[in-house]
Regions:
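Short, charged, amphipathic alpha-helical segments
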Residues: 146-156
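Non-catalytic all-alpha helical scaffold/repeat segments
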Residues: 1-110
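Amphipathic alpha-helical coiled-coil segments
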Residues: 157-171
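Short amphipathic alpha-helical heptad-repeat segments
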Residues: 121-133
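Short, charge/polar-rich alpha-helical segments
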Residues: 111-124
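Residue at a conserved register position within TPR or TPR-like alpha-solenoid repeats
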Residues: 139-140, 157
Length: 173
């Protein structure tokens, strides 16, 4: 890594990002197993290797998208408690706040997709905004950092909902 924090291996970073972007089963936190130690060990190893080879930024970006594949927690709220613990423990690390969290929000939005029904007063985005806002309130005490992330996700859906409503008003009223 050079003094600017950018990877020296830009071409390889992009390839590494593409490889990580295709993985959707989180070690230690998936529908088959929930093992915090396995997850923590895996993520530590990934970060160590990324740092060693100068891929920190690319890996941080990719990890955000990757962790957005988390299953719901035992309480039915996304993300799983293991991922929530990761956010609570690492939220103030620059790689998490600058790269990982924004890509987590975008990644979750992207694989849920937009479901727009033109000319309809209700839409998927509005429903999702309400869901994530309610979930953020429910976990706020135990997982304040994750609650903040869910609020960002809710805000993203709220913005999309308003954009859809504006188009609806313009073209379907």
């Amino acid at each position: 890594m050079d003094d600017s924090g950018e990877s020296k291996n830009n071409g390889n970073s992009i390839s590494f990002y593409k490889i990580l972007d295709r993985i959707t089963i989180i070690p230690g936190c998936n529908k088959y197993t929930a093992d915090k130690e396995a997850f923590d060990s895996w993520i530590t190893n990934v970060r160590t290797i990324a740092k060693e080879y100068g891929y920190e930024k690319a890996v941080s970006l990719s990890l955000g998208t990757f962790l957005s594949h988390s299953p719901n927690g035992e309480d039915g709220i996304f993300p799983h408690e293991i991922i929530r613990d990761f956010f609570e423990e690492n939220a103030y690390e620059s790689y998490v706040s600058e790269y990982l969290i924004p890509n987590f929000v975008v990644g979750k939005s992207n694989h849920e997709g937009a479901k727009v029904f033109w000319g309809s007063s209700s839409n998927h985005e509005k429903h999702m905004a309400e869901k994530y806002n309610n979930d953020a309130k429910i976990i706020k005490i135990d997982y304040p950092e994750t609650s903040s992330i869910l609020k960002r996700l809710s805000d993203s859906y709220e913005w999309s909902s308003k954009a859809v409503s504006s188009i609806d008003e313009r073209y379907f009223d």
